[in-house]
């Protein structure tokens, strides 16, 4: 992969435009940025070829499922951390894999169809990997914001307003055809409607209508990610905190409005809030926490850590400097090997039968020191 210089201002404006309108044609983007269509296309090709920026999309809801996200901490034995991380990063339902500073080795963010699926993943996938020492999982009860909504914020206000399309929010329940469409788009989010129609055996009109419905209903999350070091955000930090339940809505609304915040999630567990931020320097971590304390004094930060290497971000594998290496389209976890192992455990639980020990065999005696008499058992 070629080495590339850091982003210039036009690069960052292009990224912001694509974060807002990821499928806009180059002519529209060129007019928005005040350059030619060929310039925008050429710029984007250079960024993607260097692994500095990339597009992605993934479903936020699945047909007939109450899917959810879990934040999993993984401890590894010495010398096995990256072996474990690489195996976990290959799992298609895993959004993020991060090597952290502090008391946990890896942080994994993944999606699951139900709680039983999470149990199988912890017990029969992670638990079976050579090098995994321990796992701890917290379930995301509310996702207040996530990284697909983060913006580079490099467009002028007038341009930014012009690029935003206001659409009414409607509740959309996806079906199997929607899932096929979203999975296909995950491989190339700018795939033309005609080619999408050909790959999914749908008409172009149907594809366009479904895409509009999925986007306006927030079923499909579009994202344009960047190599954060090259983009000027070299520090990625994560904070765990506790909030009184009655203050969660007010405090998280403030957090979501802070530019540095990439993820803000309410979770189960003793720390009921998890926040991820991008920062310009380590010094900015203290400044961010100071602002946080002034805005939300009732929030207690219980722990914090810094990313050492984010190996996976939104389904994309990254090098140590945050550049994209390759993509793994996000999809449901293929559970079969783990499910087979779980079924064997269930069968063992179902068929194991150990009769309670006879009092005499167990050495049980009554108040008088004698063994109680049992019906049908003759004294020896």
Model regions and ranges:
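A compositional/biophysical signature of low hydrophobicity enriched in polar/charged and small residues
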Residues: 1-380
């Amino acid at each position: 992969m070629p080495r590339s210089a850091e982003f210039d201002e036009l690069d960052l404006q292009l990224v912001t435009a694509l974060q807002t309108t990821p499928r806009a044609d180059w002519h529209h983007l060129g007019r928005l940025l005040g350059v030619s269509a060929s310039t925008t296309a050429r710029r984007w090709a250079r960024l993607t070829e260097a692994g500095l920026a990339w597009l992605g999309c993934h479903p936020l809801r699945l047909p007939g499922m109450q899917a959810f996200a879990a934040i999993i901490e993984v401890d590894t034995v010495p010398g096995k951390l990256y072996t474990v991380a690489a195996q976990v990063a290959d799992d298609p339902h895993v959004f993020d894999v991060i090597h952290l500073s502090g008391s946990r080795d890896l942080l994994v963010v993944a999606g699951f169809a139900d709680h039983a699926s999470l149990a199988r993943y912890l017990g029969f996938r992670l638990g079976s990997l050579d090098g995994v020492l321990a796992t701890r999982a917290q379930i995301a009860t509310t996702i207040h914001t996530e990284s697909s909504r983060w913006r580079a914020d490099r467009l002028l206000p007038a341009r930014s307003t012009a690029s935003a399309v206001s659409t009414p929010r409607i509740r959309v329940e996806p079906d199997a055809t929607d899932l096929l469409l979203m999975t296909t788009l995950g491989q190339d989010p700018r795939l033309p409607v005609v080619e999408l129609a050909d790959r999914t055996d749908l008409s172009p009109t149907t594809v366009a209508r479904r895409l509009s419905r999925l986007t306006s209903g927030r079923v499909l999350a579009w994202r344009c990610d960047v190599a954060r070091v090259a983009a000027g955000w070299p520090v990625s930090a994560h904070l765990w905190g506790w909030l009184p339940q009655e203050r969660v809505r007010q405090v998280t609304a403030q957090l979501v409005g802070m530019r540095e915040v990439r993820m803000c999630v309410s979770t189960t567990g003793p720390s009921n809030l998890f926040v991820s931020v991008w920062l310009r320097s380590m010094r900015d971590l203290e400044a961010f926490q100071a602002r946080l304390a002034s805005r939300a004094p009732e929030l207690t930060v219980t722990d914090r850590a810094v990313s050492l290497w984010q190996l996976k971000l939104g389904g994309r594998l990254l090098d140590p400097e945050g550049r994209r290496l390759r993509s793994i389209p996000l999809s449901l976890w293929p559970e079969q090997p783990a499910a087979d192992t779980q079924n064997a455990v269930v069968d063992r639980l179902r068929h194991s039968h150990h009769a309670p020990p006879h009092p005499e065999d167990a050495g049980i005696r009554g108040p008088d020191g004698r063994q109680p008499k049992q019906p049908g058992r003759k004294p020896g």
